[in-house]
Amino acid sequence: MPRPPKCRRVEQFPGFTFFKPSGIPMSELSEVVLSVEELEAIRLRDLEGMEHEECAGKMSVSRPTFHRILASARQKVAHALINGTALRITGGNFKLVQYMLECRRCGHRWKGAICRRMLCPSCSSMDWHRIE
């Protein structure tokens, strides 16, 4: 019986979770599902430019496991782009990292996971930053 997968550490929840080719109705498209941790692997390696060892540490997995997650993610994205399928980002086995955040407008501090469209819970400003 295989071991249950470890919970992967994800720093940022995706702000957008669905992509499809322009001009083609959804009824005519098939769909590829990319997990949240697969997207995180692409973000860390391809967008942030980190080495595999550093990415694996950030996600709390071994380097070979990180490599498998990244390879699976790249294969799914390539399939969607080349074959013109929709790409849905959902699910997986992950835990969002909680950070101390501060609003630049009102100074309110709170603990939460980073999300692209997050608002200050006090004044609804989008002008916030992470406190170390």
From Swiss-Prot:
Taxonomic superkingdom: Bacteria
Pfam families, per database record: DUF134
InterPro entries for the chain: RNA_pol_sigma_r3/r4-like (IPR013324), UPF0251 (IPR002852), WH-like_DNA-bd_sf (IPR036388)
Gene3D superfamilies with a match to the protein in the record: Winged helix-like DNA-binding domain superfamily/Winged helix DNA-binding domain
Parts forming coiled coils: none
Transmembrane regions listed in the UniProt entry: none
Disulfide bond sites: none
Similarity comment text for this entry: Belongs to the UPF0251 family.
Protein name: UPF0251 protein PTH_0588
Upper classification of the organism: Bacteria, Bacillati, Bacillota, Clostridia, Eubacteriales
